[in-house]
Amino acid sequence: MALLQIAEPGQSSAPHQHRIAIGIDLGTTHSLVATVLSGKPKVLNDVQNRRLLPSIVHYGDNTTHYGEEAKPFIIADPKNTIVSVKRFMGRSKADIKFQHPYELVGSENEMPAFETRAGRKTPVEISAEILKQLKDRAEDSLQNPVNGAVITVPAYFDEAQRQATRDAAQLAGLNVLRLLNEPTAAAVAYGLDQESNLATDRNYVIYDLGGGTFDVSILRFSQGVFEVLATGGHTALGGDDLDRLIVKWAKKQLNIDVLSDEDYAVFIVAARQAKEQLSTQDSVELKLLEATLTLDRPTFESIIQVALDKTISVCKRVLRDAKLELTDIQNVVLVGGSTRSYAVQKAVREVFAQEPLCTINPDEVVAIGASITANQLIGNSQDGSLLLDVTPLSLGLETMGGLVERLISRNTAIPVARRQEFTTYQDGQTAMLIHVVQGERDLVEHCRSLGRFVLHGIPPMTAGQARIEVTFQVDADGLLTVSAREATSGVQAHIDIKPSYGLSEADTERLLIEGFQHAEEDKNLRHLKETKVEAERELESLEQALKVDADLLDEKQLDALNSAKESLKAQLEGSDIQAIEHAVQQLKVHSDAFAALRMNRHIDHALKGTKLDDWSKSN
């Protein structure tokens, strides 16, 4: 929906002035820019009439080459020619386990830099170079400055990867209106809200296999609203991986164990060409070094089957998440250049038992959707359709016992804000550590830590009296802000979650799949932890009370209370929930009597020196 803008008095722009907004598909293999002209989206060409900008940057001694001009250097100068930089965005050096020819510098737990002839370049800087090329292309083509841009990202990009994308856009001089999930952009491009039968809810699968990432989303269109019901994918699975599988096959055919960086670049280029040619041919020849190999369609299918199986597995899981059957899906939309492959189309057709939609160029569909959204956000369009993206993983914080309290569940539509009250655990507690985590498990140790901050200045109170309101807010770009505020004093603190690196493919898979596999185990373990926390709170309160009023008990009462206390402590060493609960009840038998004695003492102190007449006068 269009954002309303309020200008300063006397500074409002001319009525109905058209503002230039662009949509950018910042892809792993190729990038594009589009805009809406005369009500229709259009992909913008460069001066050579080319639409696709290869996402390649070559750093020479005195010159930097981009796109097609950088392509020849993939083989001639691979160490200084950066391709598929999107796969490095927001990821640590330790996370980057796939083969590449680059010299990476930096610590293991930080986003690395590439050592090039032009100096050290970070993935953010290189992405900014690509974005700047697209911005310049748009301004040259439209003969006007760009006022804003919508940039697409994979739905499975986490906070670190999204923030890295925003940083790159800022470095390129772009005003980012929004980061938009690529599958959502595809839905907009296909105008799925414009179909004739809109009386009933309609469900769509967006299958997006690009150069370096895979995403599948299930969208529902209902009463003018697009909602992403569920989403899943891999941050490191795409056409590049299909190329690598072909290279692996070729090495085996030629009995080659290790390739030099230069030879590897030759193999990758040949593999990519073969993959593309097999979309229209039954077989192709690969000229590799001094040998020639023939690759036919059945062999190609068997080579890439392991990757296709991964995508189909994700599709089935996302259907389960959305609580839908195959018969509930009206259309399947193919997005991403890799879906041109006949093998990919065949796999999708067989799983969903229908012909997928691929009438819009799969390389351009995301940029087209982004341009339509940008046109809406800048205020040029009156289209009232609403897009709701979702959080890919649950967000929560750590509570006593190392338990996770979820505030925002997985697949919640964004933007979203959730508030919940928490309290202190100990008497006189003046600070609280807020530990933010991401994942599907019930224990903090099984989730991913996103960040920590401390709320200071909590007034000293009895445990459980303080009221701390914690707010989780995820904006339309999927970026998270967590704030905490103490009610009586008004003290507050917050953190913007910008992790130093993103999730690896293995981490993403672990967080999701283990959540399903260990659901029952986690439920039982959570019950045990909660029972222990309550028992420990009882013991802590009793210890504090005994320090003050132990003289109220005679020797026999004190011995009985201490015996029950030690019995509970012994049970807390084990994991028998019923035994712990029984020990708590036995302790309460004695502690309740002690509490009654304490209450009487405090009432006596309060009434000491007070006459009956004083009560009569007060009433």
From Swiss-Prot:
Signal peptide (UniProt feature, chain positions): none
A GO MF label: ATP-dependent protein folding chaperone
Source domain of life: Bacteria
Keywords, in A-Z order: ATP-binding, Chaperone, Nucleotide-binding, Stress response
CDD domains, A to Z: ASKHA_NBD_HSP70_HscA
HAMAP family: HscA
PANTHER family the record matches: HEAT SHOCK PROTEIN 70KDA
Protein name: Chaperone protein HscA homolog
Protein species of origin: Acinetobacter baumannii (strain AYE)
Gene, per the UniProt record: hscA
